[in-house]
């Protein structure tokens, strides 16, 4: 049977109880098994790095996923999902380095690669367990006992198979290119891994001396002085006009400079020249015959071996000088120019960001620390035209936050540029939520994508499965562990990690020996293969053929250049199509001011802290309702508390009828809706219609992943329709006799609504939904499904839908609100009855609503009558005051205006208004018996209310409250005041609903006492008083005695249990 619940919503208690219930009943497995015959839905979880505690962003991400999957499950989808864990790469290595106190790769080498690998593995596995428990506390249902983990050999094989496909399709390339490089981590990083942040760097203008021309220089600008020792050329735009001009200083000295004609003024300003003379103009292509000298040739000997020329490049912009310094070893654009013109790829910088011996005098210096040294050397040699600083967005390593540099190194690449067109076609075949996530943001990223550098010079990662013969240089790509074991002749199994896999060699046809290249995969390649690796492909095709590609994925908008992109690239290589059918892109979590959360700013919010304080359902409901999924979520503590209050209201709504239902032994299995249909009131039919409308609205919202609309719809229904309206309407019905059909109808309707609401909230607030379900359904029906999450999603029952009634009730609620406002103006509380409410409707629909819901209006406005005026007509008891307008009367009647104004004030307002409307004028009799003609505009009109009446506007029209008191109304008002205080005292004594009491009330004011005595029976009935003593001088005693001021009247009340 239905049981009472605690008065207060205790999230911690409920969540512990439900977690244990799910565990004991094996609810997750049974729910998935229950849907095995449904339509398949394959979901791939974007794997978080196992680096520690979950943060608010990862919590939001998992909550979105869980809510959507629960919704799909209830809609009979057979779901395959496995939580994923990204367990390799710099994210893990950097954490472990921090634990071990390491500063560089040298520390790792000294510690031992195998030792370091084991530490990384241990860290990743331990953190996975901790994060799993945190996600489970969020109420997230996934196959936590069988996740996919990127460190597992079978997972690594999926990546190896994909790379072999790339090799066989000529989409794998190896070679020297200038790539993003982290000098702390000493590895290449992909474009998608570069994080941009504001940084202040040097800004210098440098003069390169033109060979064979005295005192003549071409001027370049750079923010990386450290790259000057690696300069091999200057690039100019073929279509720009350039000038050779004499630049004159204040002291009369001069020099001849070359720059874009449009930028001469900037060069003069930067160099503090006072005048200039153009000697010659030319196009960029005319400059290519010139050569120049390195400004640091005496410091960097290798520079003297280079023929420094000027070359054409379309990417040169009309900024600074229009001439770009080219160092092919330190920039992708520079590298491409170098390749195009067969220039030397000079890269005198080592992997740790320090100059090599090739840098001459700069050898051993860190390049960033060398900036001021290079600048000073240029100054000493009169090659520094100007020096300043610039604050700009500059790339940093995504994990250690070190500013990147560009280094020309040998790397492995997927030739994305060869399949870019097919990738763009694949994007169009995917359903994107929102649409612009694919058509704009993602498409733009792919259009600008370069070949993907998939190699990393690190340790803890999936080894790149390429074996190279040291003798002949032949390469072999291995696709599976079995292939490796066979070709290497290994006698036993091997773990597919460094350094273990590095020990296996493969005989080469030339008689030499192939050894594995040392690089590991870019960690983004790990997760790129998740959709087939989680299906155990390529070990088996069974699951892959049944489920792949993924029906749905969702991640943050940074994944347009991360996981969405890496998956698409790898899948196009492996299968020639997108690995997902639909994608929901969500936003970032920020603080209330819109700033990114970071420890340095002290604005980080822990989801676990929020759960500890408010509960998981509150956090879930908040993050889901706060904003559209694709907008950034600005975490606001006050809004969290508002959601918590809403859930408390939901709990109280749920709790309200339970004591009465339990007391009356209400059994919903024995009372069907059909059996009470004749006892249904309009408000019952209305709430049944409203819950259908809510189901429809939530369904529509979920179809487009408007999760915020879905949750808001539910919370608003609970607060506005249930708590503030329907519960108030039916409250008196729950106090009647147990077998009263009117009460049973209210119980059965409320039960129906609760059952539907329980299922509606279950994807979003799973703990609370389960608690409600177990009490309302499982306690009533032993044959019911074990969990609410096994239930079917509610279907709209068209028989209950009544849009006309919903509109009418909306009108009625507006009238009630207006009546409340009018009561406030009249100084009459709602507890005090009024004789009548007058409604002056503006439309027939409004009038019909009043007629249809008259009893509701009488009850909720606490009035004895509802008076309805004819549509469009004023209430006939209103007065119409005439207000003369002296500004219009004076110019017409001049000295007689003083007679006209008082005469107008005495005229019947309705007669005057009618004359103006029908005749356009009015003959006005003055005090001296003369008449004058007045016209519209000379008078304004103001409605006047009968004494003791107040009014307010509603959506239906004007509402009037007659607040005049009769003795009968006053008696009821005082009686209601007494009842309210006695009810409060019952609550204070924590009495059960049906417990009878003894009451004594002393009212010293004899007149008020006589009024209250006329309703003694009503008071006794309402407060369940078996004995009620009233008097002006009686002794008041009991378990609880209190003094009260009731509308200025002193009263003393005492109550005791019977």
Curated annotation (Swiss-Prot):
Keyword Nucleotide-binding on entry: yes
Chain span(s) of sequence motif 'KMSKS' region: 596-600
Keyword Ligase: yes
Binding site for ATP: 599
E.C. designation(s): 6.1.1.5
Catalytic activity from the UniProt record: tRNA(Ile) + L-isoleucine + ATP = L-isoleucyl-tRNA(Ile) + AMP + diphosphate
Required cofactor(s): Zn(2+)
Domain comment in the entry: IleRS has two distinct active sites: one for aminoacylation and one for editing. The misactivated valine is translocated from the active site to the editing site, which sterically excludes the correctly activated isoleucine. The single editing site contains two valyl binding pockets, one specific for each substrate (Val-AMP or Val-tRNA(Ile)).
Family note: Belongs to the class-I aminoacyl-tRNA synthetase family. IleS type 2 subfamily.
Protein name: Isoleucine--tRNA ligase
